[in-house]
Structure formats: structure tokens, C-alpha cells
A protein has these predicted regions:
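Short, glycine-/polar-rich solvent-exposed loops and beta-turns at beta-strand/coil boundaries
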Residues: 34, 57-77, 92, 127-130, ...
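Non-catalytic regulatory/gating segments with a bias toward low-complexity or hydrophobic composition
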Residues: 38, 46, 58, 114-119, ...
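Transmembrane beta-barrel outer-membrane domains
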Residues: 69, 104, 155-159, 194-198, ...
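Extracytoplasmic
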Residues: 33-41, 61, 71-73, 81-83, ...
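Acidic/polar loop-and-plug regions of large Gram-negative outer-membrane beta-barrel proteins
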Residues: 185-189, 202-273, 277-279, 283-308
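Outer-membrane beta-barrel translocator/receptor signature
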Residues: 94-95, 110-112, 123-203, 209-215, ...
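Short acidic/polar hinge/loop motifs at secondary-structure boundaries
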Residues: 66, 75, 91-118, 136-141
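Short, acidic, small-residue-rich periplasmic hinge/interaction motif at the N-terminus
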Residues: 1-47
Length: 308
């Protein structure tokens, strides 16, 4: 059961396009009516394409260029500019991809959708550049019945993953509802000597104070523990000016290198819905990213015959 008039929610629709989006103007409109170039990566598409990080989502978004600096860091660009405007549930936040605090590694299992508006977005994000804005919209406890979704999967490079998504009413009427989402993943990589373990947890409580007023409180946490992390890329040229030809699996990360990171956040929002699809919302949000790096950096022009 979805909240009244919430046409922007994508979970449960089974669709690759939203019924409406408020990403550009703050008003729920169809993509055709929206006066900017908008892509909404829905919950169905995230599941079908097995996206497991924000980098995966951005790589599948039209008009977005994704470049990885090394094993942990990615940059996202649009229309020739680096993307600097990021939001959680429409609330601007600060990302710094250069320090690898877990931003691009965020697991999309906790999100209903990811909205990308290409071009200038000063109306909703304030000062920035004309690249794009990225809005990560969290899941909510909308079901008035107990629901459970669990999965276990295995894939290439010794990738193992387990997920749990539980929703339940917390009182007889279902006016207070809770939801817990969790994931654990252990994987190696096409890169030599690299592996990563991550843990994800998200919990939210939604309470209908009246038929038109809803209070939401939630918390999210993700811990990334990679080993064999690399720092930076490889030279394009040998010392004699010739082009290098490295193996795709080559990794400068040593047994002791790592680039651990944690992402945590909390939020509380109060929304009141009026007639004719008008609503007012107040939100408090907190987020914190931390990293702990033990890294090895190599640079220079290697000799073709003798090596670095």
C-alpha cells in the first residue's frame, strides 16, 4: 500500500520508467512534461541489471561518463563537467570522490530509485555547475502487511551475496510500519590480488500521525573492507615513447594495501499532504563518510626491457 498520491515511487511497479518524477522542479510530473533531461533508474531496473554500487547505476545512465581512478575511486561526469550535486531524498549533501569515503561504492539495495537530472539544477540544488544532479531516494515502509524478500547469489570471481528485505506493521492498524534491509557481499575481482567484503544495513519506521501526515525516521550504514586496493592508474607510455600494453588484471595493490570506508546516515522527515497533490515536508538529515587507507603508489615511465 503506497502513500497517498505518491506517484514517484517505483518499487512494486515492475516498470523501467516512473509514473511521475519531481527530480527537476519539485513537482510530480511525467517525464514528457518535465522541462529538463531526466533519467530515473527504477527499483525494477536496479534488480534486473544486478546493480550493486552507485558506480554501476551511473554507468547505466544515459549521458553520464564514468571513469575509475583505481580499484575504489570513480568520477562521474556529464556535459563535460564533473558532477558535484548529490542529494539524499532531495536534501543536498557533500560528496568528495577523490578521497574514496565509500560514496561511489554505496549499495543501491536501500534505494527505491536514483534520479539523474542532466544540466544546471540550481532550482533545487543551489550553486553548482551545469553537469547534473544525482538524487538517491531511500525505500520506505509502505506495506501494511508482513512482507519478506531474501536472496542468495554467486557469480564470477568468487562473488557471493546475500540480501534480506523485511517489512511489517508495528501496530494492529498498520499506521506504524517498519522496514529492515540488509546485504552482505564477499567478492574477488578480475584484478590480481584483490578482494572486498561489504556489509549494508538500513532501517526505517514510517508512522501515519493522521490520514494526511506521516513521520519517517531512518538509519543506514555500509562498511567496505577491500584488500589489495590500488592507488592510481598505470603509465600510458614507456620511457622510449612507445605505448604500454598492460594486462587488464594488473594490480599495483600489495597484500597489505587496503582502502576501507564506512558510510552512515540518519534522517527524520515530517510530511503533510493537502488536496490537489500539494504537500509540505520538513526534513533533518545527517551523513558521515570515513576512510582508512594503507596504500602503495607507483609512478614514472617504465623501461620497456628492464621494467619499472
Amino acid at each position: 500500500v503506497e502513500g497517498q498520491g505518491d506517484l514517484t515511487t517505483t518499487e512494486g511497479t515492475g516498470s523501467y520508467t516512473p509514473r511521475a518524477t519531481a527530480a527537476s522542479t519539485g513537482l510530480p510530473m511525467s517525464l514528457r512534461e518535465t522541462p529538463q533531461s531526466v533519467t530515473v533508474v527504477t527499483r525494477q531496473r536496479i534488480d534486473d541489471e544486478n546493480m550493486r554500487s552507485l558506480a554501476d547505476v551511473m554507468a547505466s545512465t544515459p549521458g553520464i561518463s564514468v571513469q575509475n581512478y583505481d580499484s575504489e575511486r570513480y568520477s562521474f561526469n556529464s556535459r563535460g563537467f564533473a558532477i558535484s550535486n548529490y542529494m539524499y531524498d532531495g536534501i543536498p549533501t557533500s560528496f568528495d570522490m577523490g578521497y574514496a569515503g565509500g560514496e561511489s561504492s554505496q549499495d543501491p539495495i536501500i534505494y527505491d530509485r536514483v534520479e539523474v537530472v542532466r544540466g544546471a539544477t540550481g532550482l533545487l540544488t543551489g550553486a553548482g555547475n551545469p553537469s547534473a544532479s544525482v538524487n538517491l531516494v531511500r525505500k520506505h515502509a509502505t506495506s501494511r502487511e508482513f512482507t519478506a524478500d531474501m536472496s542468495v547469489s554467486a557469480g564470477s570471481w568468487d562473488t557471493y551475496r546475500a540480501t534480506v528485505d523485511l517489512s511489517s506493521p508495528l501496530n494492529a492498524s498498520g499506521s506504524v510500519r517498519g522496514r529492515i534491509v540488509s546485504a552482505y557481499q564477499d567478492n574477488h575481482s578480475f584484478l590480481d590480488n584483490y578482494e572486498n567484503r561489504k556489509k549494508v544495513f538500513y532501517g526505517v519506521v514510517d508512522a501515519d500521525l493522521t490520514s494526511r501526515t506521516t513521520l519517517s525516521v531512518g538509519f543506514n550504514y555500509q562498511d567496505n573492507q577491500p584488500k589489495g586496493s590500488s592507488w592510481g592508474g598505470f603509465p600510458l607510455w614507456y620511457a622510449d615513447g612507445g605505448r604500454t600494453d598492460w594486462k587488464r588484471s594488473l594490480n599495483t595493490g600489495a597484500d597489505w594495501t587496503s582502502w576501507a570506508s564506512t558510510t552512515q546516515g540518519a534522517f527524520a522527515s515530517l510530511e503533510h499532504r493537502f488536496d490537489n497533490d500539494w504537500r509540505i515536508q520538513t526534513t533533518a538529515s545527517y551523513s558521515k563518510n570515513e576512510m582508512d587507507g594503507k596504500l602503495l603508489y607507483l609512478y614514472g615511465l617504465p623501461d620497456r626491457n628492464t621494467g619499472p
